[in-house]
Amino acid sequence: SRGKPSQEQLDLSMGMMDVLSSYSDLACEDGTDCRNYGVLDGIQEAKVLIGDMIECNPENIIIYGNSSLNIMYDTISRSMTHGVMGNTPWCKLDKVKFLCPVPGYDRHFAITEYFGIEMINVPMLPTGPDMDMVEDLVSKDEAIKGIWCVPKYSNPQGITYSDETVRRFARLKPAAKDFRIYWDNAYCVHHLYDMDQD
């Protein structure tokens, strides 16, 4: 598969393999034994660590596995079968549409294709998706249920959404009550250059 780190890159993290041993304290502050299944929303210490990294309150964080693509798939699958926040399950609707910034991440598009969701191309600009088009489409069509977003270093162009683009996403007024922004911020801390993190 593509995008896998090289052996040299993997070797950079070898020191982490020696941090824990059979003598390590593997209990959380709340008493949870980290060797066991844990809790549904994730280990509190991990939530605090990630919260500090992304400037988010740990109470608003859920820790999943290491694949954002799995999270996206599971979220779409659940929306199809159970709906979003009490709304009609998408599988019971005549039409479900999704906005797809292009060029974009083909594996996001594969998820929508798998579930038979109609994809609407939205051109990428140097600042992110064409927000004039996004605002117009979502405000007029309640069949549009979401948009795929990779806001930092978006594949394949490496575009990072501008602050204004992010603000416009926050101000969207979608016709669909169950419209969601699928914000796959997988590269939020993976900067290539110390001095250029946009």
Place the predicted regions along the sequence by residue.
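Glycine-rich phosphate-binding segment of PLP-dependent enzymes
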Residues: 2-37
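Walker B catalytic acidic pair
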Residues: 184-185
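Conserved core of the PLP fold type I
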Residues: 23-26, 30-177, 188-197
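Pocket-edge structural micro-motifs
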Residues: 1-2, 65
